A protein has these predicted regions:
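Long, non-coiled-coil amphipathic alpha-helical linker/lever segments
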Residues: 14-46
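Long amphipathic all-alpha helical oligomerization modules
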Residues: 44-119
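A broadly tuned preference for mixed-charge, low-complexity surface segments
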Residues: 12, 17-23, 50, 114-119
């Protein structure tokens, strides 16, 4: 902390996390929980594929929610942010969060393929 203050970097950390950023983070946490639950189902998915399929569907639904949050945020960002450098930084951070939800959905697609192949 003293190093940050002594180098005048304190302003770097003054930006508040947007509600959209918090919402994307919350959605990512939900996806992580569902991926964990899906992994627990892998041992028995041949006997009861519906449980695993349900988690895959939840991952898909959450990713769609994340797309909506991201698109709304980006629209608002381009309308309100006047500093081009800040706009680019914030956009990239939010894009990385949104990409994380895409990857979680991809996990769900892979698991659905396992159901089709082995159930």
């Amino acid at each position: 902390r003293d190093l940050v203050r002594s180098r005048g970097l304190g302003d770097v950390y003054k930006r508040q996390i947007s509600d959209s950023g918090k919402e994307l983070s919350r959605l990512i946490q939900q996806e992580a929980v569902y991926i964990g639950k899906a992994m627990d189902e892998l041992e028995t998915f041949r006997q009861k594929p519906a449980a695993l399929r349900g988690y895959c569907n939840k991952l898909h639904d959450i990713e769609n929610q994340a797309d909506d949050v991201y698109e709304h945020f980006i629209t608002k960002l381009f309308e309100e942010e006047k500093d081009c450098i800040e706009l680019i930084k914030i956009k990239e951070i939010m894009h990385e969060l949104e990409k994380t939800t895409d990857v979680a959905e991809q996990v769900g697609k892979i698991l659905k393929n396992l159901i089709i192949k082995y159930a």
